């Protein structure tokens, strides 16, 4: 099961319908900051699972999910007395043909028949028409009336769906996101719990309750409670200290996950990232998921540890579709430049027109900084370090002391062997590159 294409409209960065196509196996989203890489991953995940930032999207509806320009246009129309329709978020996932025949139809923005997919919307609900009309007449609207919105899922056959019944599942892995509760990482605790069988959870609950009971029976605690009771002036009842027995699964908030005897929150950030990713790829939810979404797997990792992680991700890709965002040339080279999807403004392009030997070269020699060329606006390619110094000085002498990088021009030393391969990348991107000192 794989996604062939995604169309996003009015969700965060993307106002106009934005289309991106995917390979069946590995896909790498690259682009400058704020280019929409994370937004695409979030859009796919919420459309398949109904989850956003770890919570049900129905409980997370907010004006900040909408494209700001679309919201401002709507508010301006209301202020001018000619209100347009409230903006609507639309996310469409197009599945590989033959994956889910029952999801086939023309209920998509392209109005095309014979296509399988799911359509997710956050839109104004008609059942609130009277309330909305009253609001327009009686109050000044200065923000999107999100209380009148609802989230819905439809197959392309126009049948309404619940996300938990969508056969294609995704898992979102963001190892750089840290959410701590009582010193324990919420994400890692949830993943570890997922490994446990019901009898294991029962055993932990019983052991935790026994620990609380022992605390209450401790002689020192009983003596302290007697002092507190004697010193207090409460009219009814006695004051005392006790461990909170809480609810049935209270152990989840009081126990912490450890790595080699060290609480997970106090382990190195690099170790945390690689452990999170490895566990997330191997836990039950990921095993059931056919689509793995990974946010910047290189976070906090050294070159050698990142190399190990690439092997784990490549292994996980077997039989599943992986869509990852990255700023790392090593990740891009190792997982294949042919899988690259470059985001730029409202457009995207792939690198599949590169020669096969170029893909293979950068896979074998993954240390080259290919993304530096791919993401820059303009570049000057030179063969050696001395050439770079000469070009930098020549540019300064003719541009009032300014360095090329200050004008958005990146001077790159690429060496003689890789020169033609960098040129091939530049030609694929149709960038304007100046090549000096060959």
Task: Map each language-model feature to its residues.
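Switch/communication elements of ASCE P-loop NTPase nucleotide-binding domains
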Residues: 1-49, 250-372, 388-393
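Conserved P-loop NTP-binding catalytic core
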Residues: 43-112
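Surface-exposed acidic, glycine/proline-enriched linker/cap segments
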Residues: 62-78, 355-375
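Conserved catalytic network of the ASCE P-loop NTPase/AAA+ motor domain
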Residues: 81-86, 110-113, 144, 282-287, ...
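Short glycine-/polar-rich loops that comprise or flank the Walker A/P-loop
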Residues: 87-91, 113-118, 146-149, 166-170, ...
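Electropositive, glycine-dotted interaction segments
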Residues: 90, 96-218
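Extended helical coiled-coil dimerization/tether regions that scaffold
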Residues: 192-275, 279-291
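Conserved helicase/translocase motor-coupling segment
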Residues: 378-382, 386-438
């Amino acid at each position: 099961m794989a996604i062939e294409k995604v169309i996003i409209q009015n969700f965060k960065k993307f106002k106009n319908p934005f289309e991106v196509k995917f390979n069946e196996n590995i896909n790498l989203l690259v682009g400058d900051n704020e280019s929409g890489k994370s937004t695409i991953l979030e859009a796919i995940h919420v459309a398949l699972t109904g989850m956003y930032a770890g919570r049900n999207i129905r409980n997370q509806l907010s004006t900040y999910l909408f494209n700001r320009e679309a919201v401002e246009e709507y508010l301006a129309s209301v202020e001018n007395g000619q209100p347009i329709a409230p903006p609507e978020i639309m996310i469409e996932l197009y599945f590989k043909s033959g994956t889910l025949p029952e999801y086939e139809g023309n209920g998509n923005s392209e109005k095309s028949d014979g296509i399988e997919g799911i359509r997710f919307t956050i839109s104004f609900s008609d059942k609130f028409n009277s309330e909305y009309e009253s609001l327009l007449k009686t109050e000044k609207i200065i923000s999107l009336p999100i209380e009148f919105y609802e989230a819905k899922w439809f197959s392309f056959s126009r049948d309404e769906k619940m996300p938990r019944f969508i056969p294609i599942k995704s898992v979102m892995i963001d190892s750089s996101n840290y959410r701590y509760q009582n010193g324990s990482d919420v994400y890692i605790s949830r993943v570890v719990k997922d490994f446990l069988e019901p009898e294991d959870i029962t055993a932990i609950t019983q052991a935790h309750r026994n620990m609380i009971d022992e605390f209450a029976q401790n002689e020192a605690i009983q003596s302290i409670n007697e002092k507190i009771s004697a010193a207090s002036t409460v009219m009814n009842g006695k004051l005392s200290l006790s461990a909170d027995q809480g609810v049935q699964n209270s152990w989840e908030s009081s126990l912490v996950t450890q790595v080699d005897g060290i609480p997970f929150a106090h382990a190195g950030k690099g170790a945390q990232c690689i452990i999170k990713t490895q566990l997330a790829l191997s836990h039950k939810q990921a095993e059931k998921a056919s689509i793995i979404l990974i946010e910047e797997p290189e976070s906090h990792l050294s070159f050698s540890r990142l190399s190990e992680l690439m092997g784990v991700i490549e292994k996980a890709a077997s039989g599943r579709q992986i869509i990852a965002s990255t700023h790392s040339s090593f990740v891009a080279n190792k997982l294949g430049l042919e899988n690259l999807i470059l985001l730029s403004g409202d457009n995207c392009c792939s690198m599949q027109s590169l020669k096969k030997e170029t893909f293979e070269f950068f896979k074998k020699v993954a240390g080259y900084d290919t993304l530096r060329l791919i993401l820059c606006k303009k570049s000057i390619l030179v063969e050696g370090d001395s050439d770079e110094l000469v070009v930098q000085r020549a540019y300064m002498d003719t541009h009032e002391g300014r360095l090329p990088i200050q004008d958005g021009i990146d001077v790159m030393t690429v060496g003689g062997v890789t020169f033609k391969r960098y040129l091939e990348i530049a030609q694929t991107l149709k960038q304007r590159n100046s090549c000096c000192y060959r």
